[in-house]
Amino acid sequence: GDKIALIGRNNPRWCITYMGTITYGAVIVPILQDFTPADIIHIINHSESRLLFLGDNFWDVIEEDQIKQIEAVFSLTDFHAIYERDGKSLTKFQRDIVKNYRTKYPRGFSVNDIKYPEIPNDQVVLLNYTSGTTGYSKGVMLTVNNLTSNVMFAATTINTQTGQRYFQKGGRTLSFLPLAHAYGCAFDFLAPLAVGGHITLLGKIPAAKILLEAMAVVKPTIICCVPMILEKVYRKQVLPMLEKGPMSIAMKIPLLNSAIYSVIRKKLMDAFGGNVGIFIVGGAPMNQETESFLMKIKFPITIGYGMTECAPLISFTPDNEFKAGSCGRFLKGLLEVRIDSEDPQRVAGEILVRGEHVMKGYYKNDKDTHKVLDEEGWLHTGDMATMDPDGTLYIRGRSKTMILSGNGQNIYPEEIEDKLNNMYLVLESLVLDAGNGKIKALVVPDYEQAEAEGVDKADLPQIMQNNLQELNAQLAA
């Protein structure tokens, strides 16, 4: 039950610490690297962690007297003790460990020497702190059952057309999502580990150039990613081919479409190593134009939906059954899902979830736990969606961000942002309620792309104004 805090870039010692903690029967507390120093200190203290494992650079932003309950701090570079409260015991232990190991196992350590404690399914083994938008993040209590159910689902899921498992022994994964995030940990680490897959950890920020170079070397058989990865490839590599040059002309000839799509598909597959069986996309909504094009060229993509509170998976569909605009079917047999709406197929309502994946609650936070977990065990996700009779979910937006227009219509900012983000030189956008039934959009231009195309920064305001006019025309239509 002791808590062990863990923060650092993806590397083998991060994984060893994680597995060593939960198989020992303690509770792992992974912390996202991009949290502020204040958030990191809060999580360490709030979780009551006794030990801390971290990348050396993080120790520079933490003062010893800010984490008084921590008894020792270890480096994820080589596991040496950076700090110990009494200044003696750990240093002696580390010095004697090799001698003690040889004494206890004179013939060497074998599989028969491995013993794990009996850990009940409902025991908390993971405290995953969410990246909250207001105030401090909440510690999601996840149990053995929550993690095991997610991993076993992933390990046994197949392409129903080929009968082949997505995660398989000898399969190759390039792990570049942050492992401290529930999505990355479950499907870039635990699932491939459980089936005997080969995991390559990318210990760098996954910039496009670094990522594609790594793909060429690793040649992954499965890729778990966020939408932005594929959206950037579509915008910066595919769109220019379709809008300029020979392909743009050939695209106007119907008989050549399928041949061009095959060429583009092969180029994209080769860029990702050439051996990918499926791209599992999650973590955020995907741009509809990008998704539509990838499906048109028969790119092996599926989009899932989940949240930290479900460790994380709620819905998933094999790529050969995936429906456009959806985020897959909810996991029948593991979860119950219902839409809080009088007409769930047509009118969006809040997604409610109950079952094997649902968290135990928020650590030391009964107030927020009761806000999202009702007496019948339903988790109120805050996400608005419609649902097909077969359980396929179509997310419209967040209940907290929904805007009521002047004519009484429900407006989901995410749907407008989706259109805006696909416009010329738009990198990101945020749609807000401006009051009086009106909305406004904040836009971040793609300065990198503008520079590459020789566009003067002074021209960007007019370009964004043109985008606004085009957006209004689309919304009016």
Language-model-detected regions and their locations in the chain:
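Conserved AMP-binding/adenylation subdomain of ANL enzymes
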Residues: T148-R172, L179-K266, N275, P300
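Structural core segment of the AMP-binding/adenylate-forming
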Residues: T23-R102, G437, N466
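Conserved ATP-binding loop and adjacent catalytic segment of the adenylate-forming AMP-binding
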Residues: T200-L202, F279, M286-G349, H357-K360, ...
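AMP-binding/adenylate-forming catalytic core of the ANL superfamily
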Residues: F35, L52-L54, G355, K360-G361, ...
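Conserved AMP-binding/adenylate-forming
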Residues: G1-F35, F176
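Conserved ATP-binding/catalytic segment of the ANL
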Residues: I7, R338, Q345-S405
